[in-house]
UniProtKB/Swiss-Prot annotation:
This is Exodeoxyribonuclease 7 small subunit. It comes from the Bacteria. Keywords: Cytoplasm, Exonuclease, Hydrolase, Nuclease. It catalyses: Exonucleolytic cleavage in either 5'- to 3'- or 3'- to 5'-direction to yield nucleoside 5'-phosphates. The lineage of its organism: Bacteria, Pseudomonadati, Pseudomonadota, Betaproteobacteria, Burkholderiales. It holds the Pfam family Exonuc_VII_S. It is an enzyme of class 3 (hydrolase). Bidirectionally degrades single-stranded DNA into large acid-insoluble oligonucleotides, which are then degraded further into small acid-soluble oligonucleotides.
């Protein structure tokens, strides 16, 4: 299982940490990195390392989402339709995004 940075570690380790096995783990680590960077307590070097790690985590999460999307397309076949502008997703109901 992949090691995630604890609060006492440097911002993102030495840059050679393996990516997490799961999307949820990567997202949690990414959220933690963002919070630490927004806190402003990181040195410039740690901020750069955190940014690099964050970029790798974002790429991993995007890949995982693309894989799931492909699986959904296979399962749903031609029943998938583009999201129209009048759907609930654009009504502002989800403030967590």
């Amino acid at each position: 299982m992949a090691k995630t940075a604890s609060p006492g570690d440097t911002a993102a380790g030495n840059g050679t940490e393996p990516l997490p096995d799961k999307y949820e783990t990567a997202l949690a680590e990414l959220e933690s990195l963002v919070a630490r960077m927004e806190g402003g307590a990181l040195s410039l070097e740690d901020s750069l390392a955190a940014y690099r790690r964050g970029a790798a985590l974002v790429a991993f999460c995007q890949q995982q989402l693309e894989k799931v999307e492909q699986q959904v397309r296979v399962l749903d076949g031609a029943t998938l339709k583009p999201l129209s502008s009048g759907t609930a997703a654009t009504d502002g109901d989800d403030d967590d995004l």
